Amino acid sequence: MEKKRFFEPWIPEKYNEGINGKKILVFGASYYCKEVNCPYYKDCTSVEKKDSSLYDKRCPSYIASNRCLHDEPSYTTDGARANSNFARLFSPYVKDGEDIWDYLAFTNYVQFFLPCSKDDSGKVSSAPTLPEHLSPRDFDAFIEVIQEQKPDVVVIWGTVIAEPIRDRQNNPFIYDLDECFDNTEGYICHMNIPNVDHDIVLFNCYHPSSRSWNESFEDAARYLDVLLKR
């Protein structure tokens, strides 16, 4: 059967051990390509085609490192500001000196590389993921990865990817949206997915690179504590 996902999720050594016995899978929003001078850049990052797979083994930058595009995020779990901000949320649940990313599985929701922007000075930077960057394939890949990894908790970064995931018409597996907003301010709800023999907890927080992340950090920490100590 053809895979819906393009990106191979990062599954660390201690994923099955989990945090407080819970396996946790994190979904960020998207990956970006900053190689704006690459001959394949325009096609590989096309927001119309939404498909980088043609260049999986042809990307010059990755070939030079003996890598494939689909290997992300194996090479992106170190150092990024969003990752370090997010790690702070989970740091109370691991021992001093331990890396939280030794326990948390990670991938991104959007299944192709988004383009970056280049300003007049030549500086290349990423921009926020937008609703038009998403496609039905991304949701199918989301479900596929959950079925493969069977986490107890799925963490969703940001409001853009949360929209299709928490849309009853798009996601028939979610069953307690009303209670989610009434009881947990939108942070916690649940899914029942075929081929997974337990309910999945969805934990929706703001994106760790956003201003709202810092503004709502205490709320997120409070609901995460409730979730992990159940």
Question: Language-model segments: which ranges?
Answer:
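A polyanion-binding, active-site-adjacent surface
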Residues: 2-149, 153, 159-163
